[in-house]
């Protein structure tokens, strides 16, 4: 049976490096796995007042359904002010509510942070992991995926350097091993 990996990209920018990286990770999934990109840019900010039957935003219902249908999760995000972008944090909140109905629990996760700077989104990576611990999303610990200096790893046509793709493949292979230990 094919396993489905949901990919959430924290950057909303059309020509985002994060989207390029996420697409490459999706391509590297082995046979028996497929990916789906889960849209977060249309989610109204979480507000508990909207959690009444008949008032729940349609985008929240769609998002929760899509996350609920996947077996594992890839989070690919930039770093904003040493944390994750508001759109991604909002997606985590929307998926975790109403209390007791979280769609996140038990789905193996991979955190990839992409940055033009040298630290490769270290702050966002760890801020996201902290939220994922609370949401019961076990995450791959090694190798860590900090993709720094991204502008030097992608050419003008959007092709990612071979050595970087090899690193992505190593990460993907380790994630699949991790996933298979957790999901039977």
Name every feature range the model reports, one short phrase each:
Residues 18, 22, 60, 88, ...:
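A general structural signal for well-ordered alpha-helical segments in protein cores
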Residues 40-57:
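N-terminal beta-loop-helix "entrance" segment that forms/cooperates
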Residues 8-10, 38, 112:
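Short hydrophobic segments within beta-strands
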Residues 55-136:
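Helix-loop-strand module that forms the ligand-binding subsite of alpha/beta enzymes
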Residues 138-184:
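Glycine-rich phosphate/pyrophosphate-binding loop and the adjoining helix
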Residues 30-36, 138:
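A generic structural motif
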Residues 2-32:
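N-terminal beta1-alpha1 ligand-phosphate binding loop
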């Amino acid at each position: 049976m094919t396993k489905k990996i949901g990919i959430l990209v924290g950057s909303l920018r059309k020509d985002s490096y994060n989207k390029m990286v996420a697409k490459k990770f999706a391509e590297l999934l082995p046979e028996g796995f497929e990916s789906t990109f889960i849209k977060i840019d249309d989610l109204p900010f979480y507000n508990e007042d909207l959690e009444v039957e008949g008032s729940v935003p349609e985008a929240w219902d769609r998002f929760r359904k899509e996350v609920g249908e996947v077996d594992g999760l890839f989070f690919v995000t930039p770093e904003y002010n040493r944390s994750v972008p508001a759109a991604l944090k909002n997606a985590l909140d929307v998926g975790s509510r109403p209390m007791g109905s979280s769609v996140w629990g038990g789905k193996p996760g991979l955190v990839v942070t992409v940055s033009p700077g040298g630290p490769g989104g270290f702050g966002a990576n760890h801020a996201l992991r902290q939220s994922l611990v609370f949401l019961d999303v076990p995450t791959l610990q090694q190798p860590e995926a900090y993709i720094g200096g991204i502008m030097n790893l992608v050419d003008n046509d959007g092709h990612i350097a071979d050595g970087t793709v090899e690193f992505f493949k190593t990460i993907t292979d380790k994630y699949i091993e991790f996933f298979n230990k957790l999901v039977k």
